[in-house]
Every structure is written in structure tokens, then in C-alpha cells.
Amino acid sequence: MTNLCPCGTGKSFGECCEPLVTGARAALTAEELMRSRYTAYTRAEIGYIHDTTHPDHRADFDEKGTREWAESSQWEGLEILATAGGGPADTEGRVEFIARYRDTGGRRTHHELAEFRKVDDAWYFTDGYGIKPQPAVSTKIGRNDPCTCGSGKKYKKCCGA
């Protein structure tokens, strides 16, 4: 049985993110770097997370906080929602993603729009912006509206009674 890569591609770790996290090769795209950074979090490879942060932004890197978050979380999955740019021929890219994890407070999601820049053929993370969930929009059911259960009765005479 193969050890699947935590980044969610369905490939084995050895043929997916391991060569990037170990430094055997560089990421070819911003999305590939994003996936490998997520994998590094799941394995608490803080050195890789630091090294793939753009040099201009490393002064803001909190190694202790990053290590605590990585080690205290049970990583449950990565979902890439959208990418813009970030291809092999690009110099900038954005990746919107959701990382799911569990900590002492329960299940959590980290929804972010991450920005990447390529310098000398190497992709780097430059910044990330948290995306807040949109409030659920629901319509109020009127008492004289048809019941949502599909009975054909008015709501007030069915489930609203």
C-alpha cells in the first residue's frame, strides 16, 4: 500500500510532495508550492515552510508559533478552490484554498487567498489573506406558503403547526 500524499492529489507522498519538502527539486507552479507547504505543515517541516517564504517576508515568520500550530493540529485535508496565474511561465500567482484540521477546540477550517512570486525560477509564498465565511442566506417561510416537506399542504397546517 502506498503512503498517499497529504496534499490531496491522490499520488503517493514519494512522487508528489516529498521531493519538494526534502529539497530534491523546486516547485514548478504556485499550486504545487501551496500543496507542498500544506504537506510540510502536516509533517511539521518548519524549515521548509520558512525556506519557501519569500526572503522579503521572512522577518515576519513566527517559527515557534508555526511549529506549535503544525504540531498541535491533526490535518484532515486540503482543497484548492481557485488558482490565478502561478504557472511555469508566470512570475506571480494566487491560490485560494481551504485547509481542514482539528485541534483542542474541535474541527476548524483555514480559508485563505495565498500570493506567490517566482524569483530565479523558484516559487515563494509572499502573503496570505484570510477569507471569512459568507453568512447563510435563508428565506423565511410564510405561514400560507406551501410546506417545504413537499406534502402540498400550507406550512401552517403541516410542519408549521
UniProtKB/Swiss-Prot annotation:
Please give the name of this protein. Answer: UPF0225 protein GSU1048
The protein's matches in SUPFAM superfamilies, at most eight in alphabetical order, are given as:
NTF2-like (SSF54427), Sec-C motif (SSF103642)
The family line of this record is: Belongs to the UPF0225 family.
What superkingdom does the record give?
Bacteria
Q: Which NCBIfam families match?
A: PRK01617.1, PRK01752.1
What InterPro entries would the database entry show?
A: NTF2-like_dom_sf (IPR032710), SEC_C_motif (IPR004027), UPF0225 (IPR023006), YchJ-like_M (IPR048469)
| A matching Pfam family | SEC-C
